[in-house]
Amino acid sequence: MSNIGIIIPERAADIGNFMVGRLLPFIEKRSVGPFVFIDHMGPAYLKDYQNLDVPPHPHIGLSTLTYLFEGSIFHRDSIGSAIEIQPGAVNWMTAGKGVTHSERTPEYLRHTDKRLHGLQIWVALPKHLEGSEPSFHHTEAADIPAWETDGVHYKLIAGEAFGKTSPVPVHSKLYFIEIKTGDKHAKISIGNDLYGESALYILEGNIKSEGNTYEPKFILIAKDAKLCEFEMDANTTVYIFGGEPFPEERYIHWNFVNSDKQVIEQAKHDWKDQKFPKVPGETEFVPLPATSLK
């Protein structure tokens, strides 16, 4: 990767009863293409008395993408969706004008030892879709485009790249790509397949570029779309994400994303007044925090 512009470290963040590694936003780089938020969950080893319990909370102006490496999460939302997500599958929830959802350990796992590891991602919506009706789409792992080239394994989790299109129904030009090596190192050259802004997240293993070695838990932001050439060690996994940025700035407060600060202010009042749609089967209420997202 011959044109690294910014290197972002993973930073610890508390999301209630669960610690995560925050990758975006970052003070020097608030977004990459339409991607405005990425949390790395785990890897966590939960005892039989420990569970993931993220109670009902709201979103506007974005789509959430949940992708697991290990474990399982049960998703419920105010649209009526109720589904378990397992490794390799994708949950894509578009908040639009407003949605509420919860994420919890499935009931059948709540009294067992378990592992949880994955990514939680927010993708901003185009301005004309920020007030759209909410929707939810689940894509099974078997339906995600996957292929092998010269011993390197690729998955196009979302978006368009390499002449392929993921079935995940995204709303703008973007890509979210998994690249894995096996027991051999590999040279990667994919600059011509990308567009817009680009970044690379190292999940495990190491990559080398221009004599430098980069280890896990860092995002490398490219100066342009050409994440040109880099070498992956054996047993390395990276995620490349990005796409075309929007012309308007995006503002973030708590779980709200929008190009208009007044829309966020209205969403804050609506959540305080409990005017957001409810999640069937859920009764908890999370108060609006006093501070904005860092």
Where on the chain are the PLM-derived regions?
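Jelly-roll (double-stranded beta-helix
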Residues: 1-294
